[in-house]
Amino acid sequence: MKVSLFITCLSDVFFPQVGKSVVEIMNQCGVELDFPEGQTCCGQPAYNSGYQEDAKLAAKQMIKAFEHSEYIVTPSGSCASMVHHYYKEMFKGDSEWYEKAVHLADRTYELTDFLVNVLGKNDWKSKLVEKAVFHQSCHMSRALGIKEEPLKLLSQVEGLDIKELPYCQDCCGFGGTFAVKMSSISETMVDEKIKHIEATEANLLIGADMGCLMNIGGRLRRKNKNIQVLHVAEVLAKGLNK
């Protein structure tokens, strides 16, 4: 099986360790992984801001970059949902690119979805002794319907005590450009999220979207809270070396 890694902007620039963790996970699974260098931003910021033509240019570049990939895996539900849902919306009325967009979407998987539903991983051998909570990101849970997959994998990590996070599916306030355009509302939302995290007395927050982790993690640091923030890929990969 050959898999191409769609790294995403946030992992490339801010969370390179997440990309490295995905590579370690795929190696553990015996998957042949490549990295198409022509990949770029999925176009979501431009699309959400109303710059349709710019978003189309990004989408076309992505389609070209992964044209020959058997499977495409990304550690981001947000970017995966962009490819799955909005590429097809953008190219309605353009039969050539619409078909290419559908073909790309059919081969693109969020990481935990791929591990559970394609590779059938139900015996993940890793160990990490922490008390943790898991944050459900909006795009991943609502747009893609991926809710149980990350929890199923995390339940297999020896020593990891997952506490239930109240209102776990409530938005953290990131929302891409929303956090910039409506920063005061975003700040209120993330403070509410942190209140619920603290109520669990967990010392580790796990998520599957780096936008959420950047937003919550940044706010935790500004408030001097001693709560670590990790992507689910980092948790699964860390345990491999224990």
From Swiss-Prot:
GO terms for biological process: lactate metabolic process. GO terms for cellular component: cytosol. One of its GO terms (molecular function) is oxidoreductase activity. It holds the Pfam family CCG. Signal peptide: none annotated. Is involved in L-lactate degradation and allows cells to grow with lactate as the sole carbon source. Belongs to the LutA/YkgE family. This is Lactate utilization protein A 2. The lineage of its organism: Bacteria, Bacillati, Bacillota, Bacilli, Bacillales.
